[in-house]
């Protein structure tokens, strides 16, 4: 059998075995997107979290999704909703009840990450929240989300924010 040159390993052009597969951050981004939709549904329809999770797993392809992270967000946000909302209120110019439900879902998800997932840098949390608001929110919703999260991050991650401003 004659070997094809293209099959040989070329150290100048290394191709990892997982080339073409989504990265961990890409899988988490997809988990956040689905979790935002699921949290919106939970807020609007008041279905049980287990029902919503089961529906999302049937209706969506989880191949490129961090399923464990999706589940952690979906069950984690409602578990500390009171703490999340209490943290959000001082950073907002309008009442929670008046907020667009999509933006509320994004802000709750992002606040949960700031509180519970200190392994995720605050700048990543803010960026992901803004991107979610661009995808799902109203025309300028991302600007509102950015403003709220910019105020919230120093309150919840004071040391990390100060260290990054040096």
Swiss-Prot record:
Stretch list, region Disordered: 1-28
InterPro entries (UniProt xref): NusB-like_sf, NusB_fam, NusB_RsmB_TIM44
Keywords: RNA-binding, Transcription, Transcription antitermination, Transcription regulation
GO biological process, one term: transcription antitermination
MF terms (GO), sorted A to Z: RNA binding
This protein's GO CC annotations: cytosol
Gene3D superfamilies: NusB-like
Keyword check for Lipoprotein: no
Keyword rRNA-binding: no
Basic and acidic residues compositional bias, start-end: 1-18
Cited function: Involved in transcription antitermination. Required for transcription of ribosomal RNA (rRNA) genes. Binds specifically to the boxA antiterminator sequence of the ribosomal RNA (rrn) operons.
Record family assignment: Belongs to the NusB family.
Protein name: Transcription antitermination protein NusB
Organism expressing this protein natively: Pseudomonas putida (strain ATCC 47054 / DSM 6125 / CFBP 8728 / NCIMB 11950 / KT2440)
